[in-house]
Amino acid sequence: MDNIEQDVKVLRKVLNGPLFLDKYPLISRVWVEEYGTNRIDIILNVKDPYSEYTPLRDEIKSYIYNLAKMLGVTTRFIIYP
């Protein structure tokens, strides 16, 4: 298994688990997809109203980056929205 495949597997499992979804209940699901050979896309499914997500967006992204660092994820990734 390639490093990017392992990173996708780990991120998918953790970001769709209670550690993340219980902390941020306004996110209902997270898609983690390999994009090409050198990047991962992370797509957050935000529950309505979206306006509740906007003030927490930077905090959530920072939490994901820190969590990925602790998990040893080395592949570059982008978080949407």
Each language-model region and where it sits:
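N-terminal presequence-like segments and adjacent domain-start helices
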Residues: 1-10
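Long, terminal "pre-/pro-" and other extracytoplasmic accessory regions
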Residues: 7, 23, 52, 78-79
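Short, aromatic-enriched amphipathic alpha-helices that serve as compact interaction elements
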Residues: 11-15
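Short secondary-structure junctions
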Residues: 16-27, 68-73
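Short edge beta-strands and adjacent turn/loop segments
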Residues: 21-45
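A short interface-forming secondary-structure element
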Residues: 40-59
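Low-complexity, intrinsically disordered Gly/Pro/Thr-rich segments
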Residues: 58-66
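A short amphipathic beta-strand at an alpha->beta junction
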Residues: 65-81
